[in-house]
Amino acid sequence: MTLQEEIIRQLGVKASIDPKEEIRKTVDFLKAYLRKHSFLKTYVLGISGGQDSTLAGKLAQMAIAELREETGDQAYQFIAVRLPYGVQADEADAQKALAFIAPDQTLTINIKAAVDGQVEALQAAGVEISDFNKGNIKARQRMISQYAIAGQMAGAVIGTDHAAENITGFFTKFGDGGADILPLFRLNKRQGKALLKVLGADAALYEKVPTADLEDQKPGLADEVALGVTYQDIDDYLEGKLISKVAQATIEKWWHKGQHKRHLPITIFDDFWK
């Protein structure tokens, strides 16, 4: 088995999908998890205005609405959370995503004071934080807020990790990589886009340039620039297609580099890192 085949196997990616089937499968999965865990009544998810959180949020709201109708239990709720750092440049996209999702509840927590306070505390201790690491603090602070909300609201936190993100390790460890349930796992970027099209999302929500937008000094830095490879190449690779040797080498480099993010903290019994 080639490395490409092994990665595809691990991430469960299909070469082609039926978007309607995947929508139904995901909604049923989200419903089943809450039914199995009777102490949970809500899903919590940060909404950025990008493709991934828009899709995960819409599917979560659909699942919650169906659960309420099927059980008569009005305690089932989907809580969308806006988590800007100061003023978000593409706030209009976030509001467009919220209008599409139509969440039961929307909370807004501005993380700027918490992030800046942490950076200042570190500086006071003599630790200077790079702009890149400050970006990771932002991602982790967003999860702190989401887990606080989930803890108070009998909730589970939804993550937006999907195959094209997982293969590159393009997420912050214990930040956006920390979640309870991953409804988009197995889908690549273009497949997620296909689901949004079927769901009737505004094209602007899935055609915009993907960006983590974590660094102050590189606002709106495109994912593809940061990774040095296009999502088209990543998606083709995940669908078992041939791509250029340069693109393949870049993708596989990120796969190896990000292995630690796909595992629980390393113990003496682990050998994947050797």
From Swiss-Prot:
Tell me the residue numbers annotated for binding ATP: 46-53, 160, 189, 211
Positions with a binding annotation for deamido-NAD(+): 140, 173, 180, 260-261
GO CC term (a single one): cytoplasm
Q: What is its EC number?
A: 6.3.1.5
Q: Where does Mg(2+) bind?
A: 52, 165
Instruction: Provide the reaction this enzyme catalyses.
Output: deamido-NAD(+) + NH4(+) + ATP = AMP + diphosphate + NAD(+) + H(+)
**What SUPFAM superfamilies does this protein's entry cite?**
Adenine nucleotide alpha hydrolases-like (SSF52402)
| Listed InterPro entries | NAD/GMP_synthase, NAD_synthase, NH(3)-dep_NAD(+)_synth, Rossmann-like_a/b/a_fold
What keywords does the record list, in alphabetical order? ATP-binding, Ligase, Magnesium, Metal-binding, NAD, Nucleotide-binding
Q: Superkingdom, according to UniProt?
A: Bacteria
Pathway named in the protein's UniProt entry:
Cofactor biosynthesis; NAD(+) biosynthesis; NAD(+) from deamido-NAD(+) (ammonia route): step 1/1
Biological process (GO) annotations? NAD biosynthetic process
Q: Which family does it belong to?
A: Belongs to the NAD synthetase family.
Could you describe the subunit structure of this protein? Homodimer.
Per the entry, what this protein does is: Catalyzes the ATP-dependent amidation of deamido-NAD to form NAD. Uses ammonia as a nitrogen source.
Tell me what this protein is called.
NH(3)-dependent NAD(+) synthetase
Q: Which organism is it from?
A: Streptococcus pyogenes serotype M5 (strain Manfredo)
